[in-house]
């Protein structure tokens, strides 16, 4: 199926979603709604085991919200509904049952940075830049940045970035834990795909359990988080993949996981 704002390619159990809104891949309301529909399809598709989210071109992952739409936000109730819709979408990405890798090919600013923070893992080109510059427009991050950035890098560093509206380099993003890997720009697409392919070969049920335990558990007190882990572990232990994994270990062969 063809999409208006995104390109979707599936290969070797990996779905590559490309934000295709030149020149800077802004996230319009229509684009965000479309992204939700894409996630609907990919979640149901058993041939897809991991996802890559990236931007078209070589300069920008996403510059964030389409500021031209702000004037048509309407009253408080309408604006609150719009923000809630975005929060729900980004929460869905964060809780997606299959690994989601942000492949950051350039600038990730504002909502674009908040989008990549909602992904499970992130790999960036060495020329990429990150920022939440909303304060310079007299507003503030509203797509989850005030909540996810402190959880990823710590409160004081997050406040510094948001209060100053500063940009940071890919190398600094790596050093503070905002991304997992930084690679030369010309190798980004290949490295992201190989990483996603490696994850796609893993046990789907166990990976879903890990994601749920980490994301949901981190929002709870430790005893409740451990309860989430316990419930997921008990479910995973009963799968065919668990039996296969143990058998492969003792047979000294590579396991073949089926997601059952």
Regions found by a protein language model. Give the residues of each.
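Conserved CoA-thioester-binding segment of acyl-CoA-metabolizing enzymes
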Residues: 1-54, 91
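Terminal low-complexity tails and localization/encapsulation signals of metabolic enzymes
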Residues: 1-3, 247-260
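CoA-thioester-processing core
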Residues: 89, 93-95, 103, 109-163, ...
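Well-ordered beta-strand positions
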Residues: 121, 160, 164-166, 172, ...
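C-terminal long alpha-helix characteristic of the crotonase
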Residues: 123-128, 179-227, 234-235, 240, ...
């Amino acid at each position: 199926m063809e999409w208006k704002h995104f390109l979707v390619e599936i290969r070797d159990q990996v779905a590559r979603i490309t934000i295709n809104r030149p020149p800077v891949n802004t996230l319009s309301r229509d684009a965000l709604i479309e992204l939700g529909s894409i996630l609907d399809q990919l979640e149901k598709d058993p041939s897809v085991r991991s996802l890559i989210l990236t931007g078209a071109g070589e300069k920008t992952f996403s510059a964030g919200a389409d500021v031209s739409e702000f004037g048509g936000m309407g009253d408080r109730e309408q604006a609150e509904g719009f923000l809630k819709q975005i929060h729900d979408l980004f929460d869905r990405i964060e809780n997606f049952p299959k690994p989601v890798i942000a492949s950051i090919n350039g600038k990730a600013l504002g909502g674009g940075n908040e989008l990549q923070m909602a992904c499970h893992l992130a790999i960036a080109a060495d020329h990429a830049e990150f920022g939440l510059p909303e304060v310079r427009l007299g507003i503030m991050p509203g797509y989850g940045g005030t909540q996810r950035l402190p959880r990823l890098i710590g409160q004081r560093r997050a406040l510094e970035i948001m209060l100053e509206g500063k940009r940071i380099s890919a190398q600094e993003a790596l050093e503070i834990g905002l991304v997992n890997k930084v690679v030369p720009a010309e190798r980004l697409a290949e490295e992201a795909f190989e990483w996603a392919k490696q994850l796609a070969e893993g046990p789907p049920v166990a990976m879903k359990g890990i994601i749920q335990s980490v994301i949901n558990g981190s929002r709870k007190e430790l005893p409740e988080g451990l309860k989430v882990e316990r419930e997921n572990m008990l479910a995973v232990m009963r799968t065919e993949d668990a039996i296969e994994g143990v058998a492969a270990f003792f047979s000294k062969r590579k396991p073949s996981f089926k997601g059952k």
